[in-house]
A protein has these predicted regions:
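Sec-dependent N-terminal signal peptides of Gram-positive bacterial secreted proteins and lipoproteins
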Residues: 1-26
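Sec-dependent signal peptide cleavage junction
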Residues: 18-36, 40
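A cross-family detector of function-defining hotspots
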Residues: 34-37, 43-72, 77-118, 123-127, ...
Length: 191
């Protein structure tokens, strides 16, 4: 608490002496304060860390199925055909046998052997789309925590997963947030 008061006093003092535009400084102060709070949260035991998720037995089912609306991007659900995605969203910016891309949003298929061109995963790599709950690439992980709650899994690469999965397997059905620093860098929805 004492540290916050000292930092706040220094920032206000610098503003008074410098004569900068206060609107810009208020935005800077808000962002700086947010970073300080996020760093403090990361140091607490309440912040999700990978080592807090290692107590499960291999093969144990963990988490719950997310609501259908959480498993959609731009009105597209897992299981839609590529043709229905194109009918809904128009001509993609890129198309391969493994997926179709609209700007920073990819609808792909990782399954093989007899599975047609259906959407088995969706990936957001920029601010072209948001999740049903309003999270976008570039948002803070603290915002993800506030909106989605504690993740069902944090892996060794610090990716946060929400949904249902079988521990120590690749059987997962849900949404995953990858991060760089304290910001969302990629969002994946898959089964």
């Amino acid at each position: 608490m004492k540290r916050k008061c000292i930092i706040t006093g220094l920032v206000i003092g610098l503003q008074l002496v410098s004569g900068y535009n206060y609107v810009t400084d208020a935005s800077w102060l808000s962002k700086t304060w947010d970073r300080l709070e996020t760093n403090a949260a990361k140091q607490s035991n309440d912040w999700p860390k990978a080592e807090q998720y290692t107590h499960y037995v291999g093969g144990q089912i963990v988490g719950d199925t997310l609501p259908e609306e959480d498993m959609m991007i731009l009105g597209v659900s897992l299981g839609n055909t590529f043709d229905s995605v194109k009918a809904s969203l128009g001509q993609p910016t890129k198309e391969t046998s493994r997926g179709i891309t609209y700007g920073g949003v990819t609808f792909g298929n990782l399954k093989m052997d007899g599975v047609g061109p259906i959407v088995t995963y969706m990936m957001i790599e920029n601010r072209d789309a948001v999740t049903h709950r309003g999270i976008a690439v570039g948002d803070s992980m603290r915002k993800v925590l506030n909106v989605y709650g504690r993740p069902d899994l944090v892996d060794s690469n610090n990716r946060w997963f929400y949904g249902k999965y079988r521990y120590r397997t690749d059987m997962m059905h849900g949404i995953q947030f990858e991060q760089k620093g304290d910001k969302v860098s990629k969002i994946l929805i898959y089964r």
